[in-house]
């Protein structure tokens, strides 16, 4: 081998090593893939929803661990009852509790289930804001843990969805998991936070609920223009399938930190279109915030539990309580 060939091959090898290491650095601890959800059948393009909520909360603040806020409901049907895994704030720390109900309106508290472990990745601030799902006879609960400045998503005491790599859209935090299952995958919708403190939405998928690959083209939904209901950020997605589409409720924050729910629609679960419908609190107890939706399609009824508060705040101390309503399909053209 002559000197020029040797230099050339060493140069190619050096470039390969540098590029390989850079790709590893960019990938962080997460895997990435291109995917969509199974295509929806499509439905009436003029279909939208109206929201009919009960005037009073269905789960109010308690004593001790959930005396500050009661928010972030996640509801499933289990046997002959409903289970609600919700977040309680005691003024310093977020915990997860559980309540049960036969009708989704009258709830019985079962106590606190989960608190952060300061000796682990969870830190001392949060072990809540989760997503519950029943699969193969077991109840799975993905939750947010970690310090307030760097949240991650965990399952059974370990991080399963970490933050993204340097300068990525979810570098600073991932939170607000919402998990659905469409065989053979789980799909996890979540909020990502970048170093500019912008909140956007993304999706990941997993074959086992533990090992996730993020969508390479995340984020899938971003805040709106100045003056919009979600100009200051959006998060807390809730996704379901009905009427020929995938639908999403998400929480938008305006410049004054009032929170309202927005509605979006998709044919593949990845490419979303925001719809004009915006749902806001109509009572004194949820006058400043309506947030944290969870959706249960129960026969022909689309049931929604949500958090509400009378204080405008981006995170806690809302005087938070949990409300209930239903989504009623309507024709957008006839509403005009």
Say what each PLM segment does.
Residues 1-33, 333-336:
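Intrinsic disorder/low-complexity segments
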Residues 29-235, 240-288, 297-336:
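Beta-rich carbohydrate-recognition and catalytic domains
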Residues 291:
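Predominantly extracellular/luminal carbohydrate-interaction, adhesion, and secreted-enzyme modules
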Residues 294:
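Conserved active-site neighborhood of enzyme catalytic/cofactor-binding cores
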């Amino acid at each position: 081998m002559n000197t020029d060939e040797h230099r050339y091959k060493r140069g190619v090898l050096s470039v390969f090593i540098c590029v390989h290491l850079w790709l590893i650095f960019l990938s962080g601890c997460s895997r990435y893939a291109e995917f969509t959800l199974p295509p929806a059948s499509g439905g009436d393009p003029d279909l939208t929803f109206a929201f009919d909520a009960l005037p009073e909360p269905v789960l109010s603040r308690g004593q001790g661990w959930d005396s500050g806020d009661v928010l972030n409901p996640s509801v499933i049907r289990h046997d002959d009852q409903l289970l609600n895994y919700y977040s309680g704030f005691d003024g310093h720390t977020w915990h997860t509790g559980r309540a049960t109900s036969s009708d989704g309106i009258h709830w019985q508290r079962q106590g606190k289930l989960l608190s952060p472990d300061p000796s682990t990745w969870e830190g001392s601030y949060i072990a809540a804001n989760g997503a519950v799902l029943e699969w193969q006879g077991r109840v799975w609960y993905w939750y947010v843990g970690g310090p307030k400045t760097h949240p991650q998503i965990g399952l059974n005491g370990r991080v399963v969805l970490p933050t993204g790599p340097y300068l990525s859209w979810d570098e600073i935090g991932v939170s607000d998991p919402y998990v659905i299952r469409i065989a053979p995958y789980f799909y996890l919708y979540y909020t990502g936070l970048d170093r500019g403190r912008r909140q956007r939405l993304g999706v990941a998928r997993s074959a086992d609920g533990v090992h996730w690959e993020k969508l390479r083209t995340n984020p899938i939904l971003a805040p709106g223009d100045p003056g919009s209901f979600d100009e200051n950020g959006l998060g807390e997605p809730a996704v379901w399938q009905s009427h020929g589409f995938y639908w999403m409720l998400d929480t938008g924050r305006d410049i004054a930190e009032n929170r309202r729910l927005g509605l979006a629609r998709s044919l593949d679960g990845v490419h979303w279109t925001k719809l004009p419908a915006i749902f806001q609190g109509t009572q004194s107890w949820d006058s400043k915030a309506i947030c944290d939706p969870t959706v249960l399609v129960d026969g022909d009824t689309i049931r929604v539990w949500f958090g509400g508060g009378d204080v405008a705040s981006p995170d806690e101390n809302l005087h938070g309580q949990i409300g209930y309503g239903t989504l009623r399909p309507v024709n957008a053209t006839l509403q005009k």
